[in-house]
Regions:
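Membrane-interface junctions at transmembrane-helix termini in multi-pass inner-membrane proteins
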Residues: 119, 129-153, 339-368
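Membrane-water interface segments that mark the loop-to-transmembrane alpha-helix transition
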Residues: 12-24, 50, 55, 59-109, ...
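Interhelical loop/hinge segments that connect adjacent transmembrane helices in multipass membrane
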Residues: 1-10, 174-181, 187-233, 277-291, ...
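Helix-terminus/linker motif at the lipid-water interface of multi-pass membrane proteins
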Residues: 27-43, 166-169, 230-261, 277-280, ...
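Hydrophobic alpha-helical transmembrane segments
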Residues: 119, 126, 150-200, 256, ...
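Helix-loop junctions and terminal segments of transmembrane helices
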Residues: 62-78, 255, 259-284, 351-356
Length: 415
């Protein structure tokens, strides 16, 4: 069992991340209806499409450090020299990847008409990539100081909301939306860096090729997995935008935001808070860590079986409150996506355990296989059934991941 001290640390981190996730999704629940009415569904859909597009660059700059660097920091956090070396190596790679991302963005915007026509939206949205690159969320997770993540992002979210309500007054102001998000993202990223240098006394030193290569190797399997996951998550909104229009993209993206809230709060917060602690427990006692995972997974399943049917029944009410109207496209999409949320909830701790016990290659293989199946499935179903196809594809993919992971983890043996 987890000791009282370990439980207290985990629960403090759960509280911080849960508050962060609540604000992260509740603020858009206030902002989205306002933006939808003020700038209109077409511009709203364009911004959602741009956000989905730049998400690919966020994935690239994150690489796999959200897992690999978190784990490394959690294991060496009492050795200051090793922490500084890890921090410097990770930040060097992330900054280099950010410059590569900017180059790719420039090429796409210049040569592809769909992007060139609204180039300023994509350029302004790219600021979120820079902010995410420099914000050391992985460092705070590894040191189990999640309250810094929560405090910074909650304040940032409130600033975004205030600025949008003050300055976005009509369709002509739609460019201010990505500008505000990007500026605040940059500020929060710099704030996070300040805390790392000032509070943790971490120093940045240029690292040699050997250390950089080691970080790239450590994060590779995770990066491939995350890239594969986003091949069938971020790609849904992106593909809806490519194959339909900005208005339909707006309706569907709202449904995804609501479904993501149901998935993230508080499940993702709890799994993120537990990951560094469970990694340390596994290092000492493999059987104990496995039993903790099984117990937590069953709790997550029970909660999902209680909450998700209620959300399904009252989906039309939720959509009316969030969106300010009875949008049947959004209601139908949400109800379908809730089925996928169940499979995600029933698999959250189980699939994370593959990372805890160092089976990153298996974790990667599962998601790469599902990406290879899911990506063409998404395009085919969206082409045939529009936004409904995106939701149906999501259910099929998450059910497949659940099934493969369940039987894979059952076969694990620990000595």
């Amino acid at each position: 069992m987890i000791t009282p001290g370990e439980r207290r640390v985990v629960m403090n981190n759960v509280a911080s991340l849960s508050m962060l996730q609540a604000i992260t999704y509740l603020l858009p629940a206030i902002i989205i209806p306002y933006l939808f009415r003020v700038i209109g569904p077409e511009k709203f859909g364009l911004i959602a499409f741009a956000q989905a597009f730049v998400q690919y660059f966020i994935i690239l700059t994150d690489y796999g450090f959200s897992i690999s660097a978190t784990k490394e920091i959690s294991l060496c956090r009492d050795e200051h020299a090793k922490v500084c070396k890890a921090f410097s190596s990770v930040m060097t790679v992330k900054i280099a990847l950010a410059f590569l991302s900017l180059l790719i963005l420039g090429i796409i915007v210049y040569f592809i008409p769909k992007f060139r026509n609204d180039w300023l939206v994509y350029v302004l949205s790219f600021g979120a990539v820079v902010g995410n690159t420099i914000f050391p969320v992985w460092f705070f997770q590894g040191t189990e100081k999640m309250r810094y993540i929560a405090d910074i992002n909650i304040i940032g979210g409130i600033i975004v909301a205030v600025f949008i309500f003050l300055f976005v007054r009509g369709p002509q102001d739609y460019l201010l939306v990505p500008l505000i998000y990007s500026c605040v993202s940059l500020i929060t990223g710099l704030w996070g860096q300040y805390i790392v240098f000032r509070r943790f006394r971490v120093s940045f030193k240029l690292q040699g090729y050997k250390n950089i290569r080691r970080q790239l190797a450590a994060g590779w399997d995770i990066f491939i997995s995350i890239a594969a996951i986003n091949a069938y998550t971020t790609t849904r909104v992106f593909t809806v935008g490519l194959l339909t229009n900005n208005t339909i993209t707006g309706f569907y993206s709202i449904a995804e935001k609501i479904a993501n809230f149901c998935q993230t709060f508080p499940l993702t917060s709890f799994s993120q808070a537990l990951f560094p602690r469970l990694s340390k427990i596994f290092h000492r006692n493999k059987i104990k860590a496995f039993k903790i995972m099984q117990r937590l997974q069953q709790i997550a399943i029970n909660i999902a079986l209680i909450c998700l049917p209620l959300i399904f029944i009252f989906a039309h009410v939720i959509v009316r409150v969030v969106c300010g109207g009875d949008y049947q496209k959004t209601v139908l999409s949400l109800r379908l996506l809730l089925i996928s949320v169940f499979f995600i909830s029933a698999n959250a701790f189980r699939v994370q355990f593959l990372l805890v016990c160092g089976k990153t290659h298996i974790y990667s293989r599962i998601h790469v296989i599902m990406a290879m199946v899911g990506l063409p499935l998404i395009f085919l179903l969206i082409y045939a059934f529009s936004y409904v196809g995106a939701a149906v594809a999501t259910v099929a993919i998450e059910a497949g991941i659940f099934t493969i992971t369940y039987f894979t983890v059952r076969r694990l043996r620990f000595s």
